[in-house]
Amino acid sequence: MNNDPVGSTWKKWDLHVHTPMSIVHNYRRGSPDEVWEAFLRDLEALPPEFKVIGINDYIFIDGYRRVRQAKFEQNRLKNIELILPVIELRLDKFGGVVKKDQDGRDSPSDWNRINLHVIFDALDPEVIQQQFIGALAP
């Protein structure tokens, strides 16, 4: 048992970070290298209390690969202690969620479209690609 006199420490996490490789992102100006440099600089400029980020690029893992490369091969993102891959799945139908319309009939509810976020341990991206993304059925 660890008898650390400090006890618990609280850190801020942002588990919904979209990279320039995401379908939706805010980095559109410049060459691909310039766009990535701006993105990485923004991550490095996060307030010091942010220690964990989740790279969330829908059903793609390429942005996570690139951020890991910056952290571990280029020695960047020293302010970030942990980078987690997050896969976001958008379901256009969510079974069993209905509401009654004005005539008393079942109709789709406002909850008929939801997003699922699957947060993985900081795994090798190839494991996630092969064992999770590769197993998704169309």
Regions found by a protein language model. Give the residues of each.
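An N-terminally biased module of ancient metal coordination in phosphate/nucleic-acid-related enzymes
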Residues: M1-W111
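Internal, well-ordered alpha/beta segment that forms a basic, Gly-enriched binding/recognition surface
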Residues: L91-P138
